[in-house]
């Protein structure tokens, strides 16, 4: 999962994505193909991948950057943890030490949005 176009541009240079979900478009396998799909990479823009798609053919989830919205975060995770997922799901989060990303993931883990007030507190204001 990624947030920004610049992330997508960087990722697509190093990852051979088999499927994509971004903006208003997606190319993902049909439900009938889920059983035969393995070792495939799907790049998903967090906001685009939140609702209405099923990604349970994936059991490895990587967040390249966090969203500030708990709802978007939970929806994104829910794409892999769907009915029909028969494999253990592993989630990785890229977090740069001593950055705001640590605070964002702390809020998300506490089931909260990362807010402007939290951001200002991080800045010492």
Please report, for each region that a protein language model flagged, where it lies by residue:
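Conserved RecA-like ASCE P-loop NTPase motor core of nucleic-acid helicases/translocases
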Residues: 1-4
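Conserved helicase ATPase core of P-loop NTP-dependent helicases/translocases
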Residues: 9-12, 16-49
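Short amphipathic alpha-helical segments
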Residues: 11-13, 53-58, 74-75, 105-106
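Residues at the C-termini of beta-strands that transition into short coil/loop
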Residues: 22-25, 65, 95
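Active-site-adjacent loop/helix micro-motif of nuclease/hydrolase catalytic cores
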Residues: 28-32, 53, 68-74
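Short, well-ordered beta-strand core segments
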Residues: 42, 61-62, 80
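A short beta-strand element within the Helicase C-terminal
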Residues: 53-66, 89-93
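A conserved SF2-helicase RecA2
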Residues: 68-125
């Amino acid at each position: 999962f990624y947030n920004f176009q610049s992330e997508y541009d960087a990722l697509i240079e190093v990852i051979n994505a088999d499927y994509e979900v971004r903006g208003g478009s997606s190319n993902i396998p049909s439900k009938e193909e889920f059983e035969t799909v393995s070792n495939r990479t799907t790049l998903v823009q967090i906001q685009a991948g939140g609702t209405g798609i099923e990604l349970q053919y994936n059991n490895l989830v990587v967040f390249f950057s966090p969203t500030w919205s708990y709802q978007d975060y939970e929806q994104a995770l829910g794409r892999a943890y769907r009915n029909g997922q028969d494999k253990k799901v592993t989630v990785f989060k890229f977090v740069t030490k001593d950055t705001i990303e640590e605070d964002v993931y702390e809020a998300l883990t506490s089931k909260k949005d990362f807010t402007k007030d939290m951001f200002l507190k991080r800045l010492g204001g």
